[in-house]
Amino acid sequence: MQASDSSINTLDGHQVSAGRDESTPLLANSPQRRSSGGTSFGFAVFNLMNAIMGSGILGLSYAMAKTGILGFSALLLIVALLAAYSIHLLLRMCLLTAVTSYEDLGLYAFGRSGKVLVACTILIQNVGAMSSYLFIIKSELPAAIASFLPGAQGEPWYLDGRTLLIITSVCIVLPLALLPKIGFLGYTSSLSFFFMVYFAVVIVIKKWNIPCPLPPLNHTVTFLQAPNISECKPKLFDFSKESAFALPTMAFSFLCHTSVLPIYCELKSPSKSKMQNVANVGIALSFLIYYISALFGYLTFYDNVKSELLQGYSKYLPKDVLIITVRLCILLAVLLTVPLIHFPARKAVMMMFFSRYPFSYIRHILVTLVLNIIIVLLAIYVPDMRSVFGVVGSTTSTCLLFVFPGLFYVKLGREDCSSPQKFGACGLLVLGICIGACSLTLIIMNLA
């Protein structure tokens, strides 16, 4: 390839171009690529949203209760904008360096140590997330199934959490994770998206089925009482010590950065502007679903909202068909997120240990199988999965969402230090360090 006047350096034989236009396709339009077609814009959005939204949606109503409606709205909007901005920095660095992986950005910024650091961070974060999701499946799926089978006697195998975990891992997670391209998961990601939409719709509907003030638990809910006392008045702002514990839930609500570049690579006619539009649409739709479900969940229970939203509905509407089905839908949505997270985790392993070898289906299958076994064993045998990986996740998530994009751009960006881009990257870096330190401190305090 001929070096242009705007090339900035070369590393390991890669030409680094700083003069590309944002609408220029990053990947060459080879005959093989033209025949495969790439992933459509819609499927790319669904995949990104599936990476964004998980079980964390159940904790946002609690976060609103602890920060107030306007406080929550401002914080969630800021987090969404910061997530979009950090994705913008990642895509801009891909344009500058002509590489398409998070690990290689670390390589260009800080050499092999940077590549290993990014790969280890991605692997730890994704293994922790997948194990936590499977732990939720093991803990909650038996109760969800039992709600459809109230007459079950004894302890049948289909109500055993470990058995269900192994079955779902072998029959659902593993086959989907073995797919050669992340774009193929667009179908399951679209299904997961509709599960989340269904969840938000049910939360809105059930606002008018539970009266305020909340009745005694032995009271049959049949009508709406006027919320004319203080406990039924929503708070616009509410910042206290408890508010701080809600911030980590919100800070990581839009974490999808390990999946952004794999989705980018498979996008049909990939360019920075097109992938940025994918990210903007995905984040905007996720914000909308987050906000609607959080708002109506809070307006249903007010200060009595649980840290896991569906617990309140299970108490006051224990036999409601919509609540039973929505719990199952959330579990299925969480389950369908696991294969999507498999892709960047497997890629991190490949980049660390097999980057100099050509692609091999046997290696692809073996690495996927080993990762699947590890996360299943962690979900089965680690008794308090969410607490263990809460500490690790708060650090790795902060790095991937805020610290690395800001730090790498400070190193790789061609602008002056006083430029808006460099200033924004520095701000993102400092903010990420503060959020990570705050989240880690709060989690340790909560465990103590």
From Swiss-Prot:
Subcellular location: Cell membrane
Membrane topology label: Multi-pass membrane protein
Pfam families noted in UniProt: Aa_trans
Keyword Ribonucleoprotein attributed: no
Residue segments, region Disordered: 1-36
Comp. bias regions, Polar residues: 1-12, 26-36
GO biological process terms on file: amino acid transport; sodium ion transport
Ranges that cross the membrane: 40-60, 69-89, 117-137, 164-184, 185-205, 244-264, 281-301, 321-341, 365-385, 388-408, 425-445
Keyword Chaperone: no
The entry's keywords: Amino-acid transport, Cell membrane, Disulfide bond, Glycoprotein, Ion transport, Membrane, Sodium, Sodium transport, Transmembrane, Transmembrane helix, Transport
GO CC aspect terms: plasma membrane
Residues that carry a glycan: N218, N228
Biological function: Probable sodium-dependent amino acid/proton antiporter, could be a neuronal transporter for glutamate.
Protein name, as recorded: Probable sodium-coupled neutral amino acid transporter 6
Organism lineage string: Eukaryota, Metazoa, Chordata, Craniata, Vertebrata
Gene name for this UniProt entry: slc38a6
